[in-house]
C-alpha cells in the first residue's frame, strides 16, 4: 500500500488499488474506540442513463433505481437473515444512504472489526433479486416517498429544483416517484448492479485503531475470490441542461403553521475547472453566504427582529460537475418583503465584501471545525469518500482553505452566483 503522511495535521493515509479495480483506503487512528467503514459506489439518482459494460448503446432506467438497489442489498440472500441484528450482535451499527451521485454502505463498530468488514463486503457483493421480492419492496418505498412529500422542507426543495431544471435528473426525488418505482424490474436492478457495483467503480474506506497490514490482507484475500477484473470508467449521459430556469415562480398549498419561501439561483456548473479549484470555489461560496447571512451578522439579526424569518432560516450553495445552484429559505409571514431584502443584500455585496476582520474570523472557525472533525472517524470516512470522487484528498482541504482570500471570495461570488436566473418557490397554508 502507498503511504502518504500529512505533517501539518499528523495524519497517515494508506491506499491501494486491488487487482479487481477496488480502491482501498485505510487511516489508522491510535486510541480510537470506534472503527468506521464505508463501502461506496459512484452510483446515485443522477445515473439513470448510461452504457453498460460491453455495450456501445445508452440505456435508460426508471428514476429511483439507485435508492431501490440500496434497499434490496440488505436482503442479500434467500435465508431471510436480519442483517441489522447480525451486525448488532457483533457490536456494530450498520446503515446506508443514497445521494444524487453515490450510494454508501457503512458501519461503526467497537469490536469484531474484521468480521464486520467481511459481512459488509459479502452483503454488498451478493445481490439476490426476484420479481416477487422486488414487487414487495415497491410498496415499502412508495410509502417512504409519500412520507417525504409530507415534509415541508423536502417538498419545497424539490419544487424549487423542478422549477430550476428542465431535463436534468437533479429535479427528481432521489427515491424516484411512486410511478417510476413501479416500473422497476429485477432486470433493471441486475443491470445497474453489474455496471455500477463493479469494484472499479467502488471505494472501501476504513478508519480506526486498526492494524493496516492485517486489514489489507483480510480485504485483499476476500476480494481475490470474486474473479473480477478491472474495468474502464463507466460512460454516463453528459446531462446537458439549458442555462435559464424552467419556471420563475411556483407555489403549492399544504398544511403548515406558517408559509414558506425558498429562493433558488440556477448557476453555471463550471465544468472546465481543475478539481482543487472546483472545491475551492465551493468553499468560497460557503464563506460568502456565511458573511452575508450567518447568525453573527447584523443582517441576520435584523431579519429576526423584523419577524421576517424564524429558526427555519437556512442557505446552501451546491457546485457539482453537471449542475450548480444556491437556495435561501425560511418560514415567513412576509414572503414578498423577505424576498426583496434578500435579493437586495446579495446584489449589494456580490463581489463587494470588504470586512477583512469578519472574513479572517470565519476562516479560523472553519479551520477549527475541520481539525475537530478529524477526531470523528465517521466525518473522516464520509468526507474523504465524497472528496475522493471529486478528485481531492480530504487532508488537502486545509491547504485549500488557507489559500482563500477575501478577494478570491469576491471573484467567485461574481463567477458562481447567477442573479439573473432566480426561482421564487413557495408553500402556502391550506
Describe the predicted segments one by one.
Residues 1-35:
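N- or domain-start disorder-to-order transition segments that initiate the globular core
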Residues 3-5, 203-208, 349, 361-430:
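C-terminal regions of mature proteins
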Residues 14, 203-261, 265-269:
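An aromatic/glycine/proline-enriched structural segment found at the starts
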Residues 39-109, 292-309:
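M16/MPP (pitrilysin/insulinase) zinc-metallopeptidase core fold and M16-derived inactive scaffolds
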Residues 77-191, 310, 344, 356-382:
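Acidic/histidine-enriched segments that form metal/cofactor-coordinating
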Residues 262-273, 289-331:
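A structural supersecondary motif
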Residues 315-365:
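C-terminal structural cap/anchor segments
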Amino acid at each position: 500500500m502507498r503511504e502518504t503522511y500529512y505533517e501539518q495535521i499528523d495524519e497517515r493515509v494508506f491506499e491501494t488499488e486491488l487487482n479487481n479495480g477496488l480502491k482501498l483506503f485505510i487511516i489508522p487512528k491510535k486510541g480510537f474506540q470506534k472503527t468506521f467503514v464505508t463501502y461506496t459506489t459512484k452510483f446515485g439518482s443522477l445515473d439513470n442513463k448510461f452504457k453498460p459494460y460491453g455495450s456501445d448503446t445508452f440505456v435508460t432506467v426508471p428514476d429511483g433505481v439507485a435508492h431501490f438497489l440500496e434497499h434490496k442489498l440488505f436482503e442479500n440472500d434467500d435465508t431471510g437473515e436480519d442483517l441489522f441484528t447480525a451486525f448488532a450482535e457483533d457490536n456494530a451499527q450498520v446503515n446506508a444512504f443514497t445521494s444524487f451521485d453515490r450510494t454508501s454502505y457503512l458501519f461503526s463498530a467497537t469490536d469484531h472489526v474484521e468480521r464486520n468488514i467481511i459481512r459488509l463486503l459479502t452483503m454488498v457483493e451478493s445481490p439476490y433479486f426476484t420479481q416477487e421480492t422486488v414487487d414487495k419492496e415497491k410498496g415499502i418505498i412508495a410509502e417512504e416517498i409519500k412520507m417525504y412529500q409530507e415534509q415541508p422542507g423536502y417538498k419545497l426543495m424539490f419544487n424549487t429544483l423542478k422549477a430550476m431544471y428542465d431535463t436534468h435528473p437533479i429535479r427528481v426525488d432521489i427515491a424516484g416517484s411512486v410511478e417510476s418505482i413501479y416500473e422497476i424490474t429485477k432486470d433493471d436492478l441486475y443491470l445497474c448492479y453489474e455496471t455500477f457495483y463493479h469494484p472499479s467503480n467502488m471505494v472501501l474506506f476504513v478508519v480506526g485503531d486498526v492494524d493496516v497490514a492485517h486489514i489489507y490482507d483480510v480485504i485483499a484475500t476476500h476480494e481475490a475470490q470474486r474473479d473480477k477484473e478491472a474495468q474502464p470508467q463507466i460512460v454516463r449521459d453528459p446531462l446537458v441542461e439549458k442555462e435559464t430556469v424552467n419556471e420563475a415562480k411556483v407555489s403549492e398549498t399544504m398544511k403548515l403553521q406558517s408559509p414558506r419561501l425558498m429562493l433558488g439561483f440556477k448557476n453555471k456548473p463550471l465544468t472546465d475547472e481543475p478539481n482543487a479549484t472546483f472545491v475551492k470555489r465551493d468553499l468560497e461560496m460557503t464563506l460568502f453566504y456565511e458573511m452575508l447571512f450567518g447568525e453573527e451578522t447584523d443582517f441576520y439579526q435584523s431579519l429576526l427582529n423584523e419577524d421576517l424569518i424564524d429558526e427555519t432560516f437556512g442557505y446552501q450553495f451546491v457546485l457539482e460537475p453537471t449542475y450548480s445552484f444556491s437556495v435561501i429559505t425560511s418560514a415567513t409571514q412576509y414572503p414578498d418583503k423577505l424576498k426583496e431584502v434578500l435579493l437586495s443584500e446579495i446584489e449589494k455585496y456580490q463581489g463587494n465584501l470588504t470586512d477583512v476582520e469578519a472574513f479572517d474570523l470565519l476562516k479560523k472557525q472553519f479551520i477549527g471545525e475541520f481539525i475537530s472533525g478529524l477526531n470523528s472517524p465517521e466525518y473522516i470516512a464520509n468526507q474523504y469518500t465524497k472528496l475522493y470522487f471529486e478528485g481531492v484528498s480530504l487532508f488537502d482541504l486545509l491547504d485549500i482553505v488557507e489559500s482563500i482570500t477575501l478577494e478570491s471570495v469576491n471573484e467567485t461570488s461574481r463567477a458562481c452566483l447567477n442573479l439573473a436566473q432566480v426561482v421564487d418557490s413557495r408553500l402556502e397554508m391550506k
